[in-house]
């Protein structure tokens, strides 16, 4: 930091905020510090008196942060920032063609994070067996063993299952899918909201992921599933009822903030410009 001499610092994780506290306390942090909370609810670990501004996911997050002692004038609701490409429309037909998927049939997407963790093979089997006969796409991340296992399955040989490794095309996959099964990380959920893909949150990790799932479920954009069977039931219900699926899509659209990254960048740059003009 001494070498780069920044005009401002933006943190998207609480650990650097904590690390910077001794410098601010010793008056050795002369630039503004901004914090972007990348979950849908506030957590006390983010709260430090030396933060000049918080950028948060929603009005609810802002209220929770205020209740934890942060002055309202230091909180701005922007949404959670993700890659701008998630806000660009690919088109369902084009997205499906990219992965060799059926242009009109149901498609279910299963994601287990970058490491492809969880009972992914069991989830795939349950979804493939549904009466609607969806094509199932499983993103295995860096779990090459899982990808090879799925590729050798009967469902893969008949074209009902596609197993992908780590991919930078999650935006296209979300647009291609009728429903996505995933964990409840703030960024992944924000991406699904922007693409308006109905989300089944599978076994969220206790703590922040559970709170994320509760927020999304209360907004009608997701369903929390505790078991593989619950996942299958929800996916079956949504695939069999396009009207219900469309309601979830509309709810997701209301919660989405596709321009959050640009909005936060603009606000930070404007604040830097104001500070320079005032000579502070």
Where do the protein language model's features map onto the residues?
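C-terminal alpha-helical cap of glycosyltransferases
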Residues: 257-280
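C-terminal "capping" alpha-helix adjacent to the active site of nucleotide-linked donor transferases
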Residues: 218-219, 227-244
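Active-site and donor-binding regions of nucleotide-sugar-utilizing enzymes
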Residues: 1-69, 74-77, 83
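Acidic donor-binding loop of glycosyltransferase active sites
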Residues: 175-185
């Amino acid at each position: 930091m001494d070498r780069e001499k920044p005009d401002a610092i933006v943190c998207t994780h609480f650990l650097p905020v904590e690390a910077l506290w001794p410098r601010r306390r010793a008056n050795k942090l002369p630039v503004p510090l901004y914090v972007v909370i990348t979950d849908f609810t506030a957590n006390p670990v983010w709260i430090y008196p030396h933060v000049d501004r918080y950028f948060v996911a929603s009005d609810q997050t802002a209220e929770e942060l205020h209740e934890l002692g942060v002055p309202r004038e230091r909180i701005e609701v922007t949404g959670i920032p993700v890659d701008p490409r998630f806000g660009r429309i690919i088109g369902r037909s084009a997205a499906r063609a990219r992965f060799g998927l059926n242009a009109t049939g149901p498609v279910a997407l299963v994601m287990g994070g970058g490491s492809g963790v969880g009972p992914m093979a069991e989830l795939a089997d349950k979804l493939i067996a549904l009466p609607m006969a969806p094509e199932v796409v499983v993103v295995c991340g860096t779990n090459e063993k899982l990808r090879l296992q799925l590729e050798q399955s009967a469902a893969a040989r008949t074209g009902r299952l596609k197993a992908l490794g780590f991919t930078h095309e999650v935006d296209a996959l979300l647009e291609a899918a009728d429903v996505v099964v995933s964990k409840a990380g703030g960024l992944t959920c924000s991406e699904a909201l922007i693409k308006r893909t109905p989300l089944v949150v599978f076994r969220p990790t206790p703590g922040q992921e559970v709170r994320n799932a509760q927020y999304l479920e209360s907004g009608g954009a997701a369903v929390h599933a505790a078991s593989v069977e619950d996942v299958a039931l929800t996916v079956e219900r949504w695939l069999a009822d396009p009207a219900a699926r469309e309601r979830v899509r509309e709810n997701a659209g209301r919660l989405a903030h596709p321009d959050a990254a640009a909005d936060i960048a603009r606000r930070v740059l404007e604040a830097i410009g104001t500070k320079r003009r005032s000579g502070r």
